[in-house]
């Protein structure tokens, strides 16, 4: 499994697992940028906050970000204006601008050393295939941005890529893990209750409480900040209906060192679909570039290593002096109308998801919106991002397209001809789905050659998981749940681990491994 640059440089947190019943004003589920920022802002207001995460704080998608702080959304401004109207389009971009300003305020107020840098952003014609984008309309995009009050301009040749672009000057770069480490310290100093390796299991009502294992956090308000929202008080059926409006995509990134060049220090996003993105920042004596893209539905790429290889090849063309030092991938959640879902889903319960490629900005904005909801303060983005907002014209078609994966993979996996029991178990450091005694098993062999197995059936809605060779995870192709090599839940919408394989089935599997070893030696 690859590790992001942020994770390599992060300060390791160490908080206890919840081991008693406690009481708080607000319980926050999920310790990424949304959850930690929410806890920080609420504790600043004097509220008693309990923050829990199923692993370590910041170890989820926040640590796999490429950390672009921008108000330029994945859905183009012209498209936002066409679908929602100019005022709603302005509100969406203003949300990102507000989030950047909020992070800047916190960095200054707390004197956070997080490599904060103001940088320009360029939405540009792609490095390759530029003839296909002759009618790019970037001049119109820039003109509309100016009309709506944003400092944008059209340029004939963006730095680094040398292509026509819309330039926005007031974006930013930072180190997300260093930033969040300080926020965590402040929450603790203000009496916050922080628990790691504490997995949510339910939300009770009357009185309200978050259940985690054998213990409860009694609270007046719950903020669900878990990338893909857990079921909460809405119930499983309503949760499944809501989760079906979310589409999980995997995105890949490579990090590289390169000689210092002040002109190159900026952010870049091309017009491809899926698009490639680049950010270059000063780091010590050198510059550091992060180049990403190659997005696909989670669990649906047979050879994820190829995604990294293709990115490295293209980066070498754009920045020939770049020396790749890091690889990592992350997951982004898309919605059917291109806007996030942020708001209350029932009384006393707030969710935030669907940030697409703007997780750092929308995550920060969601924290501010959660604080406003708890304080009963009017918020200008409430209607635009509300989870129950009406579907726009294009949304039903996008919904059908994104949800076709579920029946397609169910049919493919369960109606395919039955295979005989497989003999060869995975090689060291790999996994494969095997059919053993009529069971579909997710079989993993660690570097020491030890076999472990669990059910290959995703506990969310029953699809079969796939082995991700690049990240050493089991990924569900239907709704994007991800599991560790031995079946531990990493990301929802599933809320349980893959069921462990024990007893006769595991013994049978190990016997298969011994038989295969004998066959290999005989050959």
What would you call each of these model-derived segments?
Residues 44-64:
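Glycine-rich FAD pyrophosphate-binding loop
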Residues 272-273, 297-399, 454:
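C-terminal catalytic lobe of FAD-dependent flavoproteins
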Residues 202-280, 423-424:
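Flavin-dependent oxidoreductases
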Residues 1-8, 75-81, 102-182, 190:
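Flavin (FAD/FMN) cofactor-binding and adjacent substrate-gating region
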Residues 1-26, 498-501, 506, 517-523:
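Extreme N-terminal leader/targeting segments of oxidoreductases
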Residues 144, 166-220:
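Helical element adjacent to the flavin cofactor pocket in flavoenzyme catalytic cores
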Residues 254, 433-523:
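Rieske [2Fe-2S] iron-sulfur-binding domain
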Residues 24-51:
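N-terminal Rossmann-like FAD-binding beta1-loop-alpha1 element of flavoenzymes
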């Amino acid at each position: 499994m690859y590790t992001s640059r942020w994770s390599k440089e992060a300060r390791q947190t160490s908080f206890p697992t919840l081991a008693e019943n406690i009481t708080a004003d607000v319980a926050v589920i999920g310790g990424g940028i949304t959850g930690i920022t929410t806890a920080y802002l609420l504790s600043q207001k004097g509220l008693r906050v309990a923050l829990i995460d199923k692993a370590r704080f910041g170890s989820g998608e926040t640590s796999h970000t490429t950390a672009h702080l921008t108000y330029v959304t994945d859905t183009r401004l012209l498209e936002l204006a066409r679908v929602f109207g100019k005022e709603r389009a302005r509100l969406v971009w203003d949300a990102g601008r507000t989030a950047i300003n909020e992070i800047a305020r916190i960095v200054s107020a707390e004197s956070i050393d997080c490599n904060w840098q103001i940088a320009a952003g360029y939405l540009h014609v792609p490095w390759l295939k530029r003839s296909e984008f002759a009618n790019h309309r970037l001049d119109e995009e820039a003109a509309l941005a100016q009309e709506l009050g944003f400092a944008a301009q059209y340029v004939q040749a963006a730095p680094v890529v040398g292509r026509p672009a819309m330039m926005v000057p007031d974006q930013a770069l930072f180190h997300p893990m260093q930033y969040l480490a300080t926020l965590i310290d402040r929450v603790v100093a203000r009496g916050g209750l922080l628990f790691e390796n504490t997995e949510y299991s339910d939300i009770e009502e009357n009185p309200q409480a978050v259940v985690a294992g054998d213990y409860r956090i009694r609270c007046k308000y719950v903020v669900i900040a878990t990338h893909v929202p857990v079921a909460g008080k809405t119930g499983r059926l309503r949760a499944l209906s809501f989760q079906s409006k979310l589409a999980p995509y995997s995105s890949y990134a490579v990090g590289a060192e390169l000689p210092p060049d002040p002109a190159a220090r900026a952010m870049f996003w091309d017009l491809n679909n899926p698009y490639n993105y680049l950010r270059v920042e000063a780091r010590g004596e050198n510059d550091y570039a992060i180049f990403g893209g190659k997005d696909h539905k989670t669990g649906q790429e047979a050879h994820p290593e190829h995604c990294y290889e293709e990115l490295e090849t293209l980066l070498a063309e754009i920045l020939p002096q770049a020396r790749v030092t890091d690889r990592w991938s992350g997951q982004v959640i898309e919605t059917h109308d291109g806007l996030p879902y942020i708001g209350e889903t029932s009384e006393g319960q707030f969710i935030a998801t669907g940030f697409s490629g703007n997780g750092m900005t929308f995550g920060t904005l969601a924290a501010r919106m959660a604080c406003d909801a708890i304080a009963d303060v009017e918020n200008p983005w409430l209607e635009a991002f509300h989870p129950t907002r009406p579907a726009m014209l294009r949304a039903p078609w996008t919904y059908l397209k994104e949800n076709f994966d579920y029946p397609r993979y169910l049919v493919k996996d369960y109606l395919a001809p039955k295979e005989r029991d497989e003999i060869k178990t995975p090689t060291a450091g790999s996994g494969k789905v095997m059919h053993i005694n009529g069971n579909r098993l997710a079989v993993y062999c660690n570097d020491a050659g030890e076999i472990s197995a669990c059910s290959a059936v995703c506990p969310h809605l029953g699809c079969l998981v796939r082995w991700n060779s690049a990240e050493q995870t089991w990924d569900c192709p239907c709704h994007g749940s991800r599991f560790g090599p031995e079946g531990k839940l990493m990301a929802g919408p599933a809320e349980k681990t893959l069921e462990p394989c024990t007893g006769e089935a595991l013994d049978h599997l190990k016997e298969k491994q011994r038989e295969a070893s004998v066959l290999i030696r005989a050959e």
